[in-house]
Regions:
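Alpha-helical repeat scaffolds in large eukaryotic proteins
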Residues: 15-18, 22, 43-46, 64-67, ...
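Charged, low-complexity interaction regions
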Residues: 20-32, 47-53, 74-78
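Short, charged, amphipathic alpha-helical segments
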Residues: 29-39, 56-60, 82-86
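Eukaryote-specific, cytoplasm-facing alpha-helical/coiled-coil scaffolding segments in long proteins
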Residues: 38-44, 90-93
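Short, positively charged, low-complexity/disordered linker segments
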Residues: 44-60, 103
């Protein structure tokens, strides 16, 4: 897969998630954090010129934060937003995780 394709695919899936989330947006602290997380990731993707480990780490940070807000936080997604999240989740595990390089000691639990 070409590098620009990864950036464009990420931008597309996150934009779809943002659009679906905005339709059923109910103000809460977790919802505002999620919206801020989406905006920050899209800003980073607009600046990205190529896929490198820095970008992949940013995408992983986005994924981890969003997962925490959706799974353990008080963020309730509407059905469309949840389906968009599942699509991004699947794409993230298929594309980002295999390319991500982790440096330093890691512990297998």
């Amino acid at each position: 897969m070409e590098e620009r394709d990864v950036i464009q695919e990420a931008r597309t899936t996150i934009t779809l998630l943002q659009t679906a989330f905005s339709k059923g947006f109910t103000p809460s602290l977790d919802a505002l954090r999620f919206r801020e997380n989406l905006d920050q990731m899209l800003k980073g993707l607009r600046k990205a010129r190529r896929v490198d480990n820095r970008l992949l780490i940013e995408m992983e940070k986005f994924y981890q934060t969003a997962s925490l807000l959706i799974g353990l936080g008080g963020l309730a997604l509407n059905e469309e937003a949840f389906q968009a999240w599942r699509a991004y989740d699947h794409w993230h595990y298929e594309v980002v995780k295999p390319q991500l390089q982790v440096y330093g000691p890691t512990v297998v639990l």
